[in-house]
């Protein structure tokens, strides 16, 4: 979809309600609960990715990409939702994908999607966008947080070491919130598919740290 910019007068002094009202009355697009965003450069062009946690079919959520063509125009694409194929089955991921909340980007430009599900059921998905066109070909479950009551948030990759990631764990039933450092000994190859092997290594480390993996 092609998009254009709406200029809101005195936006820097407007309250949240006024900004939303101004967008809607100006024929702007209303997304349901946008939560997080990442920006990366592809072929010299900046692309913005954001998670709309409760948008889409039955409020399940979706992730969008916006190619920033110029100061006044952009191209909006549906990056991932429940209709995106699951990597290991080649069928739509369906109800397994629910309420994408946070995003993360690794040193190779790959996008990770962190869910906001009830504690103990939240997944982190690796988005396979092999050609970097802003539309994920498939999703692979990268990690699952099975700790009772807990929610993963704030996934972050070390900018100086692609083998290291950090994940915040909050709302645990044990009341023991923490930040976990995950590291592997696999040296990533310069292709997106190699991240699957790296991801499997991280899942194993994550499971050992926080408990049994969900199957």
Which residues does each PLM region occupy?
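Short, charged juxtamembrane terminal tails flanking transmembrane helices
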Residues: 211-215
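A short, hydrophobic C-terminal helix/tail in secreted or cell-surface proteins
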Residues: 188-208
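Short, surface-exposed linear patches
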Residues: 165, 208-209
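Sequence/structural signature of beta-propeller domains
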Residues: 1-186
């Amino acid at each position: 979809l092609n998009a254009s910019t709406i200029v809101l007068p005195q936006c820097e002094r407007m309250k949240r309600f006024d900004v939303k009202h101004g967008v809607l009355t100006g024929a702007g697009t209303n997304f349901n609960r946008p939560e997080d965003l990442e920006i990366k450069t592809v072929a010299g062009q900046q692309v913005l990715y954001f998670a709309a946690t409760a948008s889409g079919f039955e409020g399940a959520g979706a992730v969008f990409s916006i190619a920033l063509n110029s100061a006044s125009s952009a191209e909006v694409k549906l990056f991932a939702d429940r209709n995106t194929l699951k990597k290991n089955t080649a069928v739509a991921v369906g109800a397994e994908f629910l309420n994408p909340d946070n995003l993360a980007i690794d040193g190779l430009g790959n996008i990770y999607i962190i869910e906001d599900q009830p504690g103990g059921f939240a997944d982190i998905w690796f988005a396979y966008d092999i050609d970097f066109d802003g539309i994920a070909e498939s999703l692979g479950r990268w990690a699952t947080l099975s700790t009772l009551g807990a929610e993963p948030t704030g996934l972050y990759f070390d900018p100086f070491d692609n083998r290291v990631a950090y994940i915040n764990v909050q709302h645990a039933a044990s009341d023991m919130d923490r930040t976990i450092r995950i590291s592997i000994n696999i040296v990533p190859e310069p292709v997106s598919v190699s991240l699957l092997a790296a991801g499997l290594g991280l899942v194993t480390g994550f499971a050992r740290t926080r408990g049994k993996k969900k199957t």
